[in-house]
Every structure is written in structure tokens, then in C-alpha cells.
Swiss-Prot record:
Subcellular location: Membrane
The UniProt record lists the keyword Transmembrane: yes
UniProt record similarity statement: Belongs to the UPF0496 family.
Transmembrane spans: 214-234
Keywords on record: Coiled coil, Membrane, Transmembrane, Transmembrane helix
Regions annotated as coiled coil: 179-208
Pfam families (alphabetical): DUF677 (PF05055)
Source domain of life: Eukaryota
Main location: membrane
InterPro entries per the UniProt record, alphabetical: DUF677
Mode of membrane association: Single-pass membrane protein
A GO term from the CC aspect: membrane
Annotated protein name in UniProt: UPF0496 protein At3g57100
Amino acid sequence: MKFCNPFLRLILRRKPISMISPTMFLLSSPTTSSSIGHSNGMLRSRSEDNLNKLGECMDNMDEDVSKLFIEFQQTDLREDPDLFRLLNHYFTTSKGVSQLCESLRTCLERSENNECLLLDEALVDFELEKLGYGGSLEEASFRKTYRDLRNFNAFYNNNSGEEDDLDYCEFLRKFQTCHEELAKMVVKLEKTMKDIDKKLRRVRGRRAIVTAALLAPVIAVIFLSKLVAGLVPIEGLSTFVASRWRKSTESLKREKTAMSSMERGIIVALKQVEKISKLVSRLESVERSISLTAEFAVKKRSSVVVAMREVEEERKRLKSTLVDLDRETGLCNGFAQFGRTVALEKITEFLSRGDKSSK
């Protein structure tokens, strides 16, 4: 609410914006009272109510959409609720991808600082204990190695019930939500693009029909009288018609460009999220394999050497997967931010042209 206060008084002076969403229907201008003594108090009270309600609505908007909403007061953004909701959904979904990446980075740091550290300790203790008995594996007890492996298994198995695993649960929740919203956004943008194409085809068809309808009577008169032909501004009439249809066509093309930039950004983000999903599955598989190997080594102590070799190989796979996940997370976040930047530029261009033409 505090964030919106500098702009709200300016907005309330503009034309009504109750078409944006159902919550804004309450923002109607206050009716005057017949009682002069109470009119000032009533107007002040209703203005404050409107200000609070508008502030609550602005709080539910995405930050970028709020800026567009404030800046371009003479455009379709205020009078087209579908466009407003589409922009709000787009920026919210795209920023959800960045939040997903932040959540995943937290999980990766936890895995690096806990699981990898426990495995490194087990491998180091194994080598030290093996050397401590002069390489004689039969005499080595590997007490520290078994302890480290038990610690790893305890962390891995009990982690689902501890507070540390809340980070991973939060990541899974955000991942499911993010993936669903991206898929919905792709469908919405595809439908919007098809609607714009239909409008463009209708505009071109109407242009031909209207031009013919306007010029047909003039041409008929020309055939009847050469004198009238010299007085009728045929070229000016056709130029006027062409300019009006050209403005409509250019506006639709700018809108299509803005929607296209949003669609490309969402598709790239969706592909990156799916890549991350595959890498997360691979990470879970590696961790599960290490846990089973460690459990086998603790129970079948005679096979500790073979088990530790497998643990060493799995440790390399774990490290490689973490590196790949970190790289893809950075790319995903970067693509999402870049997509929002490009889309915001195209949307601003589309709205600013509409704002200038309306003035």
C-alpha cells in the first residue's frame, strides 16, 4: 500500500477505471449529499475508501503492470480487462520462474554443504584407515568410514522429516505451480495471437469493401459528368480511407509483436524448466544410489572396498549433476529476466503509440 500512495491521487483524478477487474467496480465516484453540513465529511470518507480499495487492487497487480497502468492512462490497458489480466498473468508467471530458480539454488547449496561434505569425509577416512594398516584390508576396521556412511544415510533418510527438507518441499511446490502456469500462459498467448490474426484479416477485408462502397458513387458520377469529375477529390478520399485503415492495421501489428515477444519468452522458460526437471530427477537417482551403496557397505562389511569404489564414482556423478543444475538454473533465470525486459519494451511501445494517437 505504501508503494502505491505516490501515484494513487493522480490516478483517482483520471477517467474511471472500474472496467479493469470486479474489485474496481467499487471505485465509482462519490455521490453528493443534500446535506451541506455533512457533504465534506462524506466526500472525504468516500475518497479515503476509494483510495484504500484502489491500493488493495494495486497490491494484487504485478509491479511492471502497475507501472504500465499508471503511465498509460489513455490506452486500451484501462478499458480492456482481458489485456490487463493477460499482462498481469504473464509478468506474474515469468517472475515465478525466477523465484523457482532461487528456491532451487537454496536446495543445491544445501546438498553441496551437507551430502557432498559427508561423502568427502567418508572417502578421506577410508583412504586414511586403509593406509593406517599398511594397506592390509583384512586388518583394517574402517570404523570412521562406517560412521561417515551411517551419517550420510541418516541425513538422507531422515531429511524428509526435518526442517532442512522444507526447502526442497518448497521447491517442488513452486515447480508444479510454475510448470502449470507456464503451460496455461502458452495456451492463452496462442489464442490471443489467433484472435489478432482474425482481426487483421477482418480489417483488410473491410478496407476493400468500404473503399469500394465510397468510391463507387463517385465513379458513377464521373461517368455522368466530366465537370463533376474535376471537382470530386477522388485521390483525397482514397487517401483518407487508406490512412484510417493503416492506423488500425499498425496498431494490431504492434499488439501482435508484443504478444509474440511474450510468447517466445514463455516458451523458452518452459523448455528451461523442463530441463531442470530432468536434472532434478537425475540428482534424486544419484542420491538414492549412493544411499543404497552406503547401506550395503555398512551391512556387508566384507564388501566395503567395492562399495567405496562405487561411492567414489557416484560422488563424481553427484558433483557433475550439481554443476549442470547450477548452470541450467542460471540460464533459466537469465532467460526469464531477458524475456520480461524484451516483452516490457514491446508492450510499452504498443501502449505508448496508442496513448499518443488518443491524445
